[in-house]
Curated annotation (Swiss-Prot):
One BP term from GO: ribosomal large subunit biogenesis
Keyword Transport: yes
Protein name per Swiss-Prot or TrEMBL: 60S ribosomal subunit assembly/export protein loc1
Lineage: Eukaryota, Fungi, Dikarya, Ascomycota, Pezizomycotina
Compartments, record wording: Nucleus, Nucleolus
UniProt feature, compositional bias: Basic and acidic residues: 39-49, 129-151
Region (Disordered): 1-69, 129-190
Record note on quaternary structure: Component of the 66S pre-ribosomal particle.
Family per similarity comment: Belongs to the LOC1 family.
Region forming the signal peptide: none
Residue spans of biased composition, Basic residues class: 181-190
Gene Ontology cellular-component terms listed: nucleolus; preribosome, large subunit precursor
Ranges annotated as biased composition (Low complexity): 1-29
Protein task: Required for efficient assembly and nuclear export of the 60S ribosomal subunit.
Length: 190
């Protein structure tokens, strides 16, 4: 078996063991002594200056609510009051005339919008009506041209077939009917 190392650290009973351990420990001590360390940086002084700078720049900031400043770019009517510390809402003063003037202004504005919408709708309806009439007129013109063309073709036929064409057309119709009878094929399904 392999020799067991003593479990107790520190001074050993055998002379050889103590000799071996001393040079190792002395060598490690020497290497630590010879290793040069950089000089320590002054971190503490910087930390003190940073904290002092932070303390200097840190000031209390007040909110708008604490200062009680009015909000900018807001138009508040005369009768509207916003009580502090309560729910947001509009509380009208008991001034009936002021309230009625505000209501009248709003209603007039809304009626103006409605009237303008109605006017636009009427104008659009008139435009649609005019377009529809134009389309009907074009359609009627096309029909008239078609009817005139049909009449002219009929008159040309009548002029050509004053006497000879009538007898030939009767004969041709009878021949075509007999041919159609002959050409018919019967199909039986099995």
């Amino acid at each position: 078996m392999a020799p067991n190392k003593p479990s107790v650290k520190g001074k050993s009973s055998s002379k050889g063991d103590s000799g071996k351990s001393k040079p190792l420990s002395s060598a490690s001590k020497v290497s630590k002594k010879h290793a040069k360390r950089p000089p320590p940086k002054e971190v503490k002084s910087k930390a003190r200056t940073e904290s002092s700078l932070l303390k200097k720049t840190k000031k209390r900031e007040y909110t708008e609510e604490e200062l009680g400043l009015p909000k900018l770019n807001m138009i508040t009517p005369v009768g509207v009051v916003k009580p502090k510390g309560k729910k947001k809402g509009k509380v009208f003063v008991d001034d009936q005339e002021g309230m009625m003037t505000i209501l009248a202004m709003v209603n007039a504005e809304q009626e103006g919008h409605i009237e303008s919408k109605l006017q636009k709708a009427r104008q659009l309806e008139e435009i649609r009506e005019a377009k529809r009439k134009e389309a009907e007129a074009r359609h009627a013109e096309k029909k008239n041209k078609l009817e005139e063309a049909k009449q002219s073709i009929r008159q040309k036929r009548k002029r050509k077939s004053s006497g000879n064409e009538d007898s030939k057309s009767d004969a041709s119709t009878s021949k075509s009917s007999s041919k159609s009878k002959e050409k018919r094929k019967s199909v039986s399904f099995a």
